[in-house]
Amino acid sequence: MSKFSLLDHELIPHHEIMDEDDLKTVLTHYNVEREQLPKLKVTDPIALEIGAEPGDVVKVIRKSQTAGEALYYRYVIG
């Protein structure tokens, strides 16, 4: 029996852990600290699926009817 992956479900947007260079650019652009971003618990099923650890920032790429793609950033907490 194969394991179900959350990332394969059509209603779950794409999630990826950001690298430090891209993160620095985003934080500078929005003039925020990583701790000011919306939170994502490390125990959240999607965080477990992608292997996120406390302190990581996850970029969520959502499909949007008006914008095509909408980017969203979440700070992983313990």
Curated annotation (Swiss-Prot):
Catalytic activity: RNA(n) + a ribonucleoside 5'-triphosphate = RNA(n+1) + diphosphate
Entry annotated with the keyword Cytoplasm: yes
Molecular function GO terms recorded: DNA binding; DNA-directed RNA polymerase activity
Gene: rpo5
Binding partners and assembly: Part of the RNA polymerase complex.
Organism: Methanococcoides burtonii (strain DSM 6242 / NBRC 107633 / OCM 468 / ACE-M)
Subcellular location per the Swiss-Prot or TrEMBL entry: Cytoplasm
Role of this protein: DNA-dependent RNA polymerase (RNAP) catalyzes the transcription of DNA into RNA using the four ribonucleoside triphosphates as substrates.
A Pfam family reported for this protein in Swiss-Prot or TrEMBL: RNA_pol_Rpb5_C
Lineage, broadest ranks: Archaea, Methanobacteriati, Methanobacteriota, Stenosarchaea group, Methanomicrobia
Keyword Transit peptide in record: no
E.C. designation(s): 2.7.7.6
Name of the protein in question: DNA-directed RNA polymerase subunit Rpo5
Protein family per UniProt: Belongs to the archaeal Rpo5/eukaryotic RPB5 RNA polymerase subunit family.
Domain of life: Archaea
This protein's UniProt keywords: Cytoplasm, DNA-directed RNA polymerase, Nucleotidyltransferase, Transcription, Transferase
Example GO biological process: transcription elongation by RNA polymerase I
GO cellular component: cytoplasm; DNA-directed RNA polymerase complex
